[in-house]
Design a protein with these regions (language model features):
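Juxtamembrane boundary at the C-terminal end of a transmembrane helix
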Residues: 202-213
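Cytosol/matrix-facing amphipathic helices and coiled-coil assembly/linker segments
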Residues: 48-132
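Residue-level signature of catalytic and energy-coupling elements of molecular machines
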Residues: 3, 42, 81, 91-94, ...
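Transmembrane alpha-helical segments of integral membrane proteins
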Residues: 161, 165-180
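Internal alpha-helical transmembrane segments
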Residues: 1-47
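Membrane-water interface of transmembrane alpha-helices in multipass transporters/channels
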Residues: 21-30, 153-159, 213
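Alpha-helical transmembrane segments in multi-pass membrane proteins
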Residues: 27, 31, 35, 39, ...
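Transmembrane alpha-helical segments and their cytosolic interface motifs
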Residues: 1-12, 119-145
Length: 213
């Protein structure tokens, strides 16, 4: 939501600064929302899919090693348990027992040796992409809405107020994970967002004056 809000807030303010019509600002905002949301969702899909394919390949290689070099994998299992503080004799005995079941040995090796959690492979790349699209769109629509219903400086003022409020809520929500002060985090988010929008608005003004001149 934060990426969508900041990027589209900056975009519509830049276009508004160039003295574009209400329709022009709204069109730019809609284009920014769709382009950004699609880009984010595609990036998320590629990221999740690539990670899953990488993990699956590593798991296949580990199974090949179990089939072709069981003694070497048995030693690796023993070393894993010894690293956890288990005595050597007991670690070797545990490794021997585990190697009787290659499926179990494979699960333990990919988790302990490769750090792969098989549960992560069950996640849907498409679900992640849709979730990313929705989050971006929710943030991006906040600065866009005023230009769909209002005109002139009224639209700009309402856009700034609505966006600042949204930025504060996002900053405050982040404190649930960081433990930071709600007011500090919220106002910091507002400050950065307003600064970005002010810069693009100023650039838009300069471009508008230059074109008009």
């Amino acid at each position: 939501g934060n990426d969508g809000l900041v990027s589209n807030f900056s975009l519509v303010m830049g276009v508004a600064g160039a003295s574009a019509s209400q329709a022009g600002v709204a069109l730019a905002g809609i284009a920014g929302l769709l382009a950004g949301a699609l880009s984010m969702s595609l990036g998320e899909w590629i990221s999740v899919k690539s990670s899953q394919e990488l993990y699956e390949n590593q798991m296949e290689l580990e199974m090949d090693e179990l089939e072709n070099n069981p003694e070497g994998e048995k030693r690796e299992l023993a070393l894993i348990y010894m690293a956890k503080g288990i005595p050597e004799a007991q670690a070797k005995e545990m490794a021997n027992e585990i190697m009787q079941d290659k499926t179990l040995a494979h699960q333990i090796l990919i988790k302990e040796e490769l750090g792969i959690n098989p549960e992560e492979l069950h996640g849907s790349a498409m679900e992640a992409a849709v979730y990313s699209f929705i989050l971006f769109a929710i943030g991006a629509i906040i600065p866009l809405l005023p230009f769909l219903f209002l005109t002139g400086y009224t639209a700009i003022i309402v856009c700034v107020i609505a966006s600042a409020f949204g930025l504060f809520l996002i900053g405050a929500a982040i404190t649930l994970f960081t433990g930071k002060n709600i007011w500090y985090s919220g106002f910091r988010q507002v400050l950065f967002g307003l600064a970005a929008a002010a810069i693009t608005f100023g650039i838009g003004k300069l471009i508008g004056v230059s074109i008009a001149g």
